[in-house]
Amino acid sequence: MLSPEENELVTRTGAGTPMGAVMRRYWMPAALAWELPPDCPPIRIKLLGEKLVAFRDTEGRVGLIDEFCAHRRASLFLGRNEEGGLRCVYHGWKYDTKGNCLDMPNEPAETNFKHAVRLKAYPTAEVGGVIWAYMGPAEKVPPLPKFEWTQVPQNYRHLSKMRQECNWLQALEGAIDNAHAGFLHRALTDKTTRAGLRGYWENSQAPRLDVHITDYGFMYTATRALPERENYVRAYQYVMPFHQFFPSQIAHSGSAAKLKKPTVRGHMFVPMDDENSMVYNWTYTFADQPLTEADSEQLGRHIGSAPEELTADFRKVRNKDNDWLIDRQVQKTETYTGIEGITTQDHAIQESMGPIVDRSRERLGSTDKAIVAARRLLLQTAKTVLEGGDPPGIDTSYYSIRAVERVLPDGVDCLEALKSEVNPLNTHEA
C-alpha cells in the first residue's frame, strides 16, 4: 500500500516530476523500426506527455522532434518528408533530424533568421528492430540497451506493440504479478483453441515469491510445488524502470503454450502520458532454428497483437469501450475470463482499475513481494536522482540476463541452481 503522495510520485512522469526525471535517464522505445521506412510520412509519438513526430530522412537518419512548427505551431504530422528534412505545409519551414531549421522560403533570401530557429529534438538509435529515444541530460547519456533479444538475427525475434489505456506503473505491476497467471490466463479445457494456460499453473495457485535485488533492478522467482517432491520454478527479471522478462521454455498444456521453441519473452511499459502507455512486446528464441512465419502468427494471436486485433494507432480492437469483447459463454466453458488474447486479458484487468489506481486502498499479500520491491526501488530511485545521483540499470550489467523456468527437486537452492542461466549479478535478498 502506498500513501496518496507516494502514489502521485511514482505514477506521474511529465516534465518537472521526480519520476519523469528518472525516466529521462534511460533509453526509451519510441517506435518499431518498420514504422519508419526511408522518406516515409512522419508519425506521431507521445512520450512522457510530450507530443512529438518521428521521421526517417533520405540518408536513413531518424529524427524525433517537437510535433509543432516553430513558426505558427502547426502540426508537423501534416508535413512533407523531402530531401533530408521535414517541411511544414503551412509556410514551408523545413527541419532536419536534429531540429535545425534548414529553409524558410517565406523569408527574404538574405536573412539569417533560419539559423536562430531550432525545434526540440531528442537523440535516437536503432537497436534490435526498435527506435530508441533519449530525453535526458546530454552529459549523462547511458550505453545503448543491448539486451540479448536485440542482438539476435531478425528472424529469431518477434516484436509488436499495443496501447494500454492506464498509467505505466499499473501496466508494469500487472506483468510483475506472477500469482494471477493460474487464474486470469487459465484455460478450462485442453480442447479449447482460445488463449489459455494449463499444466503446472494449476498445481499451486499460491506460489512462493522470492526477490533478489540486482544492480539493474531485481530477479524474482515463483515456486510452485508439484507431486513427486518437485517444484516448478519460474525466474523473472525486472530491469529499471519499465522492462520485464519472463520465460517460455517448458511445453505446458493449454493453447497459449503451443510454441515449442524455447524462448524468453518480455514487455516494455513506456509512458505516453500519465493515463496511457505504449507496451512493446518482444520474444526471442535461443534455439538452433529461427522463428517461422507460423510461429510469429501464433505469437500474435497469443499476445492479441495480430493485425486484425489492433487499429492503425495500435489501440486494441478489444478495449474498455466494448468491455474487451468479453464472451460470457466462453467464460463458462473454455477460459477463465472469456477474453481473447493473453496480453489483452492483462490489459483488461489493469484498465478496469481506472487510469491511475488508488494504491492507498489496496490490501497486499505474500504473493505481492515483487510489486512491493518495485515500488520501493522506484521511490528510492526518484530520491537518488533528485539528489543528483545515478539511477540503477544505466550500465551494461543486464546485457546477457535471461528469464528461465525449470522443474527442480525439492530442497534445491533455486538461485544457485539457475545462476548460470539467468546471470544475476550482485544479488542479495530483498
Locations of regions flagged by a protein language model:
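Short, charge-rich amphipathic segments
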Residues: 1-4, 18-21, 101, 105-113, ...
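Zn-dependent metallo-beta-lactamase
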Residues: 1-51
